[in-house]
UniProtKB/Swiss-Prot annotation:
Protein name: L-fuculose phosphate aldolase
Enzyme class of the recorded protein, top EC level: lyase
Function: Involved in the degradation of L-fucose and D-arabinose. Catalyzes the reversible cleavage of L-fuculose 1-phosphate (Fuc1P) to yield dihydroxyacetone phosphate (DHAP) and L-lactaldehyde.
Positions with a binding annotation for Zn(2+): 73, 92, 94, 155
Molecular functions (GO terms): L-fuculose-phosphate aldolase activity; zinc ion binding
Positions bound to substrate: 28-29, 43-44, 71-72
Designated gene of the protein: fucA
Record lineage: Bacteria, Pseudomonadati, Pseudomonadota, Gammaproteobacteria, Enterobacterales
Residues marked Plays a key role in the stabilization of the transition state and positioning the aldehyde component (site): 113, 131, 209
A single BP term in Gene Ontology: arabinose catabolic process
Length: 215
């Protein structure tokens, strides 16, 4: 797909992320795999003011085009693509319930079968590191080895998928799961969870069932 169309999709995803209540202000960032690198949102520009020309290209060596400043979190986007060759889009936000669970430094367990949408029987929580650092990107790379989404301790959420629409869908789904988890925790701890065997069945079914979006 040509660059301007991808840039427009990035902007539309950012606006939809805000509309869904997953983000606010200039928090969060969005990227797509492009050529030997990626296209990513810039730093410090409110989503409603973004234009296609603001979207930044970063090559596979981490070098960005002159005259533009990429999101400070570009390193963990790059790490996500390296860790997940099947991913072509990454969405990061500070959704309230995901962030609340991350503050507890807990993974989201298998409280509902939709946990399998992220690729396993839980959604991990990557250890805290200062935003924008290589250390944080290393935590992200490890957490995404066997998952399509991870919480970031005291920070937020990352979701990656085959395209932007699927990545945003997954981010929204994880936020709902986080809300369910916090609601259940208010009643009992530990919470009842599905067994690994039950989640394995769901994972198998998800191979032929789920969100259908043209690539």
């Amino acid at each position: 797909m040509e660059r301007n169309k991808l840039a427009r999709q990035i902007i539309d995803t950012c606006l939809e992320m805000t509309r869904l209540g997953l983000n606010q202000g200039t928090a969060g960032n969005v990227s797509v795999r492009y050529q030997d690198g990626m296209l990513i949102t810039p730093t410090g520009i409110p989503y409603e003011k973004l234009t296609e020309s603001h979207i930044v290209f970063i090559d596979g060596n981490g070098k960005h085009e002159e005259g533009k400043l990429p999101s400070s979190e570009w390193r963990f986007h790059m790490a996500a693509y390296q860790s997940r060759p099947d991913a072509n889009a990454v969405v990061h936000n500070h959704a309230v319930h995901c962030t609340a669970v991350s503050i507890l430094n807990r993974p989201i367990p298998a409280i509902h079968y939709m946990i399998a949408a992220a690729g396993g029987n839980s959604i991990p929580c990557a250890p805290y590191a200062t935003f924008g650092t290589r250390e944080l990107s290393e935590h992200v790379a490890l957490a995404l080895k066997n998952r399509k989404a991870t919480l970031l301790q005291h920070h937020g959420l990352i979701a990656c998928e085959a395209n932007l629409e699927k990545a945003l869908w997954l981010a929204h789904e994880v936020e709902v799961l986080a809300q369910l988890y916090l609601t259940t925790l208010a009643i009992t701890d530990p919470v009842p969870v599905l067994s690994d065997e039950e989640i394995a069945v769901v994972l198998e079914k998800f191979k032929t069932y789920g969100l259908r979006i043209e690539e």
